[in-house]
Structure formats: structure tokens, C-alpha cells
Amino acid sequence: AIILFTSMTAYYLTRVKTGVTNVLYYMFVFSMIVPFQMVMFTMSKLANMTHLNNPPGMVLLYLGFGSGLSVFMFCGFIKSIPLDIEEAAMIDGCNPLQTFFGVVMPILKPTAITVAILNAMWIWNDYLLPYLVIGLSTNYKTIPVVVQYLVGSYGAKDLGAMMALLVLSVIPIIVFYLTCQKYIIEGVVAGAVKG
């Protein structure tokens, strides 16, 4: 969801130049410099009041918190795409959505995979947001929250269970990274300054 929405947002903000789009772009950039700790208690209360303290609600919260960096990365890459390619697609009869999904999105593939990896690693390893929003009383818990449960009172720890859970939690990220390694390198090379 983050990749789809933020790539479309970045495309619109980059290609449509108005005062409103500039303000929106800078709001996305500003959201990256505001630390989560500044908004966490307000966000936690708001999430509980609006009944976002469940897994679908967490998707919306992660979409909101992850959009700043994603829009910033997509905007930077879309600026390097020549307008001639999109104009040629328009001349061939594509509407804006067909142009985006048929022409621009395939070009954005390395950046999209880089954004996917960054967000997947962040969401998979995040402890504070699920702990604050979902809490301890529900049946839904993420792996970092469950690992914290294994620390008993007075510092007693079930180290065997903790290590087993941590190994199981690392395996999906390693597999995801190894399958996407080619695209990560392409994304880094595509974002490099050419001399």
C-alpha cells in the first residue's frame, strides 16, 4: 500500500507544479524530521479513540508514518525521468493512469523495491508503534512485542525461547533481501550522480 500510494503521490507532486503541490511536498519532507517520540502519545490516544488499534488500523498508521521518506525518494527519482517518454505515451492514446502504470511505474521499479525493503525492515522490526497502539491486552502482537513478553519479572529471561523467536524473525528479512538484492543495487546505482 505504501508503494502504490506514495509513488502516485510523488508522481502528481512532481509533474503538477502549483503552490499547493509545493506545500504538500514540503509537508512530506517535514514529516521526516519530526521524531516519532514527539507525536507518539497523541497518536496513541487518537488511534484508540478512532478504533485504529487493530491490524487494519496499523496498516493505515504505517502508511501515514512511512509516506514521508517514500514520497521523498520517489520524487527524487521521478524528476530524473524525461517528460518525452510520458508525452509519447499520451500521443499514443494513454490516459494519465495508463501512462503512470504502463510507462512510469516500470521505470520506478528499482526505487520501488528499495522503498519496499526499507519499509518492510522498519515495519517488521518496529516495537514502539504496535506496543503503544495495539497494547498488551489484545491477541494481536508483533514479534518484537512477544520477545519483550519473554522477559519475566525481576529480570528472569527465557533465553532459549527468545533466541529461537529472534532467529525466526530474522529469516524472512534475509530471504526478502537476498531475493531483491539485484534491484537494491540497481536502485543505488540509479540514484547515483553521474559524472
Model-derived regions: residue spans:
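A structural signal for multi-pass alpha-helical bundles of membrane permease subunits
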Residues: 1-195
